């Protein structure tokens, strides 16, 4: 549909993180290298607008693993506060861009706003004196929503993590202990943990990222007062992040697939509720666009049927039914493990179809997807809503599309050695030109 872009007000783009998300932990950013693309795109857009109304990019920092309702409420409060303070003004064009679980947060937010448009929300003030903003004031600004790799119908990975809660708690406990024990160098502790628990993980870039983070938060690494202050700040951020994960892991319950219709989370809305949801978007002039990601196939699983669940104590479930793994030698162990966890489980393609179809981002051609196809975290067929077969399909893993698809040296002086990493190591062929093309298209849609 053709749209007319505003020539008098700003486009305000807000990036919302997904599960385990953050704006930044020390110098590690959730959305990595998106700002340079935005700045380059925005200069050209502002020149074309002819009025100097430069688009604005915001990064929202949410709780990492809290339930969707809690995360949505925090996003609402953040937006309402910006309205009250004049950062978001009447006539501005608000666009929310979300990766992964962040898309469910946005759906829950908009659902709540649409259901209670006259709700009065107090901001910044004492009882009886606070500024107030109505829900409809936020709805009136919101014009675009972009979904990136969002588990619109849940993910098998959540089911797998929930089934292995004891292992997850042990891992988080070990990491919290490493951060808390200031009397022993953190990197040495991490290496010792890896030697005890999973030596092969130490060769993955995810392990390298964790090691970098621990090095960065060690105040003994430098005598420079600014470096020491940055280390203490990074330490506090990571400690708080891990504390949140330890105390509130409700997001996993909201992401579990195969329980469609219970209404507890947007991932499990039934067909009639989803229709009411999209009708509400249309009523308020909100347009959406979905991007799905599909990683390289790490195992040779059976066509047209769900894969068996991966059970750590059952070796017969570790690879495909015939036991002959066909993983690319370039994929690392983290990707193979997460891919296998996501491949098997309760997720089904809506309507009981054997496969689904999406539109390749690079060529515009249709591509068939198996129920077990995934990006290492989310089943790809779960991302195909509300656009269905028109969903733009990007070849890449769950971290690629947010900038973590290659290892790049850090530019800013800090103890951290690298700025970004290939966190999942899927060998999916995701490149710099794809990253830039996707994000330029996202920003163009937000402002369109």
What do these predicted regions represent?
Residues 2-5, 40-52, 80-90, 113-138, ...:
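Alpha-helix termini
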Residues 4-94, 152, 163:
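Active-site catalytic motif of lipid deacylating hydrolases and related acyltransferases
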Residues 20, 102-103, 152, 378:
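Short active-site segment of divalent metal-dependent hydrolases/proteases
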Residues 71-79, 106, 438, 442:
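Generic hydrophobic alpha-helical segments
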Residues 96-98, 148:
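Short beta-strand immediately N-terminal to the catalytic nucleophile in serine-hydrolase-like folds
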Residues 98-102, 106:
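Gly/Ala-rich beta-loop-alpha elbow adjacent to hydrolase catalytic centers
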Residues 107-112:
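Active-site signature of alpha/beta-hydrolase-fold catalytic machinery across serine-
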Residues 120, 128-448:
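Helical cap/lid subdomain of alpha/beta-hydrolase-fold lipid enzymes
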């Amino acid at each position: 549909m053709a749209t007319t872009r505003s020539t008098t007000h700003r486009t305000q783009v807000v990036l919302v993180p997904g599960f385990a998300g953050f704006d930044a932990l020390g110098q590690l950013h959730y959305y990595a290298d998106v700002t340079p693309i935005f700045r380059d795109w925005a200069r050209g857009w502002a020149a074309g607008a002819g009025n100097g109304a430069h688009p604005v990019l915001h990064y929202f920092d949410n709780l990492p693993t809290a339930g969707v309702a809690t995360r949505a409420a925090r996003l609402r409060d953040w937006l309402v506060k910006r309205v009250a303070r004049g950062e978001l003004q009447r006539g501005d064009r608000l666009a929310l861009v979300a990766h992964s679980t962040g898309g469910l947060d946005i759906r829950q937010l908009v659902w709540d706003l649409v259901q209670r448009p006259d709700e009065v929300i107090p901001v910044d003030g004492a009882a009886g004196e606070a500024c107030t903003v109505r829900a409809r004031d936020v709805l009136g600004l919101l014009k675009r929503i972009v979904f990136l790799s969002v588990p619109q119908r849940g993910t098998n990975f959540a089911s797998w993590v929930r089934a292995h809660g004891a292992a997850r708690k042990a891992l988080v406990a070990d990491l919290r202990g490493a951060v808390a024990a200031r009397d022993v160098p953190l990197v040495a502790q991490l290496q010792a943990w890896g030697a005890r628990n999973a030596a092969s993980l130490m060769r993955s870039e995810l392990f390298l990222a964790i090691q970098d983070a621990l090095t960065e938060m060690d105040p003994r690494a430098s005598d420079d007062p600014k470096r020491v202050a940055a280390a203490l700040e990074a330490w506090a951020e990571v400690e708080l992040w891990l504390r949140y994960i330890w105390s509130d892991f409700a997001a996993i319950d909201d992401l579990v697939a195969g329980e469609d219709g219970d209404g507890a989370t947007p991932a499990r809305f039934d067909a009639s509720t989803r229709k009411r949801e999209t009708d509400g978007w249309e009523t308020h002039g909100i347009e959406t666009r979905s991007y799905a990601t599909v990683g390289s196939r790490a195992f040779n699983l059976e066509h047209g049927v769900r894969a068996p669940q991966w059970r750590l104590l059952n070796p017969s479930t570790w690879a495909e039914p015939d036991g002959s793994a066909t993983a690319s030698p370039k994929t690392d162990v983290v990707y193979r493990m997460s891919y296998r966890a996501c491949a098997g489980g309760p997720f089904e393609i809506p309507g009981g179809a054997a496969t689904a179809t999406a539109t390749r981002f690079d060529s515009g051609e249709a591509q068939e997807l198996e129920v077990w196809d995934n990006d290492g975290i989310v089943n790809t067929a779960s991302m195909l809503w509300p656009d269905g077969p028109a969903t733009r399909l990007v070849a890449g893993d769950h971290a690629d599309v947010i900038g973590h698809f290659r290892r790049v040296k850090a530019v800013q002086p800090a103890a951290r050695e690298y700025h970004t990493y290939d966190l999942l190591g899927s060998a999916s062929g995701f490149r710099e030109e794809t990253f830039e093309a996707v994000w330029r298209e996202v920003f163009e849609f937000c402002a369109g």
